[in-house]
Amino acid sequence: GSQPMGAVGVSDKIYNAIVDNGPEHGVEFFHGYTYSGHPACVAASLATLDIYEKEDIFARAEKMSPYFLDAVFDAFKDVPAVTDIRGDGMMAAIDLAIDKTPGVRGYDAQKKTFANGVHIKFTGDCGIIAPALIAEEKHIDEMIQKIKDVVVKY
């Protein structure tokens, strides 16, 4: 499940400009959304931050990043339908060659990879590959192979 959580962060200069120029006795950052100040959202967010800290999630992701990026580049570098590969950290993108109409190939690839057990988000013909920050080598290998199984058929 998930909980909606948002925050507003501004510098002192911006905050003071809003406060100094706002209505007297007015609320500086009025939001009034149904989730504003929701205690369950705050509790879920704090628990998530605790997990990230205790399990050192970002360090794990940083350690896994070279493996992930190498896997992406190695898998798709010789695939004719892939025109560009790029990535940073635990996120990568592959561009598929346009086949007559832009976006058709990406849409088809998104449907087929999802049916194959992997969700890769395509915007037009650009697919974003972003494994969970806790992914292990075996998860990355499986994910990349399932995406490649679809993409090599174009």
PLM ranges: what are they?
Residues 1-154:
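Conserved N-terminal phosphate-binding loop of PLP-dependent enzymes in the Aspartate aminotransferase
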